[in-house]
Design a protein with these regions (language model features):
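C-terminal-of-GTPase-core extension/linker across diverse P-loop GTPases
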Residues: 1-7, 11-17, 21, 139-345, ...
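Conserved G1/Walker A P-loop phosphate-binding module
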Residues: 1-103, 140
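Amphipathic alpha-helical transducer elements in NTP-driven molecular machines
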Residues: 46-49, 65, 81, 85-92, ...
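A generic fold-level signal
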Residues: 34-36, 61-63, 113, 191-192, ...
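Glycine-rich, phosphate-binding/catalytic loops in enzymes
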Residues: 85-86, 111-114, 214-216
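Short, charged beta->alpha transition segments
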Residues: 84, 123, 183-186
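Conserved Switch II/interswitch segment of TRAFAC-class P-loop GTPases
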Residues: 42-43, 71-78, 89-151, 165-177, ...
């Protein structure tokens, strides 16, 4: 799982990266925008995993992880030409960092206007996809003149359908593709189809109103989900002890940190759920897509388990907490046996039986 942080220059991308990952990368008002990208793998907080680990204190606790990449700034109007396009397409989700603070000491190429920047970026992402469609169609048409190809004709038909949808103002997501058509274009990794979070770096004075992000910035309809944070305030909080940090948050009217809110929102954006395993040496959380089968969950752990799948022993973590241990739950007959088509539920504790 990977989220890419990107946006126009001087918005606070690296500040946000530090807040989310605990890194200490240098931030500067005069970054030339040509530094290397940075990547950190972050544990996803989960109270349920903490409780499970509490039942098995001798075992190591291993949370699910989310990779976060900090990309350098992209100039206005240059997304379609950016060298970062490949990295954006590889990401599972996108975090567009938007400037919402005024500070003359940190130069910004345009007047600070979050609503305008969000609209502009969403249009640029759509344009980058449209350019990819046009480029591929041109090549396909040339190739099909040389030699007929059923697969090529099929791809051409789907891309023409996408182009028509974009030209009609419905965008790629409004093309109403069939599952087989979706599969045909999956390799394009269109940016307009990726989960998108707009994170606005707000002025300190706006801290008490961050929960009403859309109202605060008069955003109107957006494809991505808007959220806001106070980068300067939270950067100061990082330097404080836990007790002092809570008091500082309260002083600015902040109920939760951006890290807490992001790690709550990110799995939902990616349509993920979590299940848990209790092994000989570890208690571990795993992420899978919602509606994943037991067989797919087995594959998330190891292909050998998927290949040799026999049965899954399943109990919800909430039920398990009531029994106090997995063995106690088994003794009471509360652990179910499920087959490979069982749909994994968020919070399931699963033991996979498999042949080697």
């Amino acid at each position: 799982m990977n989220f890419a942080l990107f946006g126009y220059p001087k918005t606070g991308k690296t500040t946000l990266f530090n807040l989310l990952t605990g890194a200490h990368l240098e931030t500067t008002a005069y970054d030339d925008g040509h530094r290397e990208s940075s990547l950190r793998s972050c544990p996803i907080p989960d109270d349920r995993l903490d409780r499970l680990a509490g039942l098995y204190q001798e075992k190591k606790k291993i949370p699910a992880a989310l990779d976060i990449t900090d990309l350098h700034g992209i100039s206005y109007g240059e997304v379609k030409n950016s060298a970062l396009l490949g990295l954006l397409r590889k990401a599972d989700g996108l975090v567009h960092v938007v400037r919402g603070f005024a500070d003359e000491s940190i130069p910004h190429p345009r007047p600070v206007n979050p609503a305008q920047d969000i609209r502009a970026m969403e249009e640029e992402l759509a344009l980058a996809d449209f350019v990819s469609i046009e480029t591929r169609l041109e090549k396909l048409e040339k190739d099909l003149k040389k030699a007929k190809s059923p697969e090529g004709e099929k791809e051409k038909g789907v891309l023409e359908k996408l182009r028509a949808s974009v030209e009609a103002g419905r965008g790629i997501c409004g093309a109403d593709l069939a599952p087989a058509e979706e599969k045909t274009i999956r390799s394009f990794a269109f940016l307009s189809q990726k989960p998108l979070l707009h994170l606005i770096n707000a002025d300190d004075k706006d801290a008490p109103r961050l929960e009403d992000t859309a109202g605060l910035y008069c955003l109107g309809p957006t494809r991505g989900r808007p959220m806001a944070f106070c980068g300067r305030v939270e950067s100061e909080i990082l330097q404080l002890e836990a007790g002092e940090a809570e008091a500082f948050l309260a002083e600015f009217g902040l109920a939760r940190t951006v890290r807490q809110r992001f790690f709550e929102a990110a799995p939902r954006l990616l349509d993920l759920i979590f299940f848990f395993t209790i092994g000989k040496e570890e208690v571990r959380a795993w992420a899978v897509k919602k509606n994943a089968s037991a067989l797919a969950a087995a594959g998330a752990i190891h292909t050998d388990i998927e290949r040799g799948f026999i049965r899954a022993e399943v109990i919800s973590c909430q039920e398990l907490f009531g029994f106090g241990s997995l063995q106690a739950a088994k003794d009471k007959g509360a652990v179910r046996l499920e087959g490979k088509d069982y749909i994994v539920q968020d919070g399931d504790v699963i033991y996979f039986r498999f042949s080697t």
